[in-house]
Amino acid sequence: MQGLNADEVLRLLRSLIPGELATGRGQRGDPPEAQDLCADSRLDAEPIRADSLDRLNLASALNRFFRLHETGVEDRLLAVRRIGDMAELIADASQHTSGLTFSTSGSTGTPQPHHHSWAALTQEAEALANALGSHPRVIAWLPVHHLYGFVFGVALPRALGSTVIESHAAPTALFREPAPDDLIATVPARWRYLFDSNHRFPGGTGISSTAALETACRNGLLQAGLDALLEVYGATEAGGIGLRWAPSEDYRLLPHWHGDATATSSALNPDGAAVTVAPLDRLQWRDERVFRPTGRIDDIIQIGGVNVSPGHVARRLESHEAVAACAVRSHGEGSRRRLKAFIVPARSDADPETLRQTLENWIWEHLPAVERPTDLRIGTELPRNAMGKLQ
């Protein structure tokens, strides 16, 4: 893979534009839906209707993601209004760029950019294609502007020579037009939705990433007709690192990775360029190719396939003038995990119910879904155990 074609770029724009507009606009209006965007959609017309500041922010985001600064054409995006023309411009420029820049997601502070070369993306896609075998159709039910979404929804279909069903059309394909040889790519929360919906599969293979699948959910999906389900372990910083076909199995490194007890490294590119990644999880190594994650090194947890820091959410809540102190923890397991918060009011005479309603409204307006505590408890001091640690 060296660069993208216009159809692939259009798929990425349908994923990127709504998210970037939502970020830039905050609570000012709803962003367009991906299914409403096509090649003839215009930035200055419905459903996008971007003003000059929207267009400037969007151009900056696209320049960063597609690395257009390497080509000298980045200024031309500001003059383009039609989405199809934008896709053509970016596709042509991508033939001369080094790769793409993906950002970490979640509540871990400012998103960090990570460059992935075309060679590295191709190598990972080809390794996955070898593991998965032939599939004429890929149902990519995940955002393709994130690393896993791009690999599963753009690079892997190219490596397989498969047609692609985009995320906004995935539910229709799954529920009304399933095929026995589909490759279904999505995240644990959506696999859980399919399991809870008692969805039946006519066969096909699944691929999942961002977090481990619950064993009961995985087994239920296989009993519902899915032939196999592959889990990919990795991170935005590194891409896919290991694969496993069953929760009872350990992960096996992809062919281009090498491991040891303290770090995982690989010669990623055909030109010999290497990358060394310190693991974000504690890894128990069976041998130099096989490992099992045993927990995070930091406080990050997975909610809805997104990395979330309870400590960061607590600090956000403590920024509210009515909150003196806050502790945030998770409750629930797997794809049903959410946050709960214990609040100490800034005023000792605060009415608990009034404060709860005030904070619930503030949380809804200021925090994304994965960071919103669904259970607020209010008391005079934070709960601690006998050792003085927060509970």
From Swiss-Prot:
Catalytic activity: (E)-4-coumarate + ATP + CoA = (E)-4-coumaroyl-CoA + AMP + diphosphate
Gene Ontology BP annotations: phenylpropanoid metabolic process
SUPFAM superfamilies reported in the protein's UniProt record: Acetyl-CoA synthetase-like
Keywords: ATP-binding, Ligase, Nucleotide-binding, Phenylpropanoid metabolism
InterPro entries for this protein: 4_coum_CoA_lig, AMP-bd_C, AMP-bd_C_sf, AMP-dep_synth/lig_dom, ANL_N_sf, ATP-dep_AMP-bd_enzyme
Record-level Gene Ontology MF annotations: 4-coumarate-CoA ligase activity; ATP binding
The enzyme's E.C. designation: 6.2.1.12
Record keyword Transport present: no
Key word Nucleotide-binding present: yes
Gene3D superfamilies assigned: 3.30.300.30, N-terminal domain of ligase-like
Top EC class, one word: ligase
Reported function: Converts p-coumaric acid into p-coumaryl CoA. This is necessary for the activation of the photoactive yellow protein (PYP) chromophore.
Protein name (Swiss-Prot/TrEMBL): 4-coumarate--CoA ligase
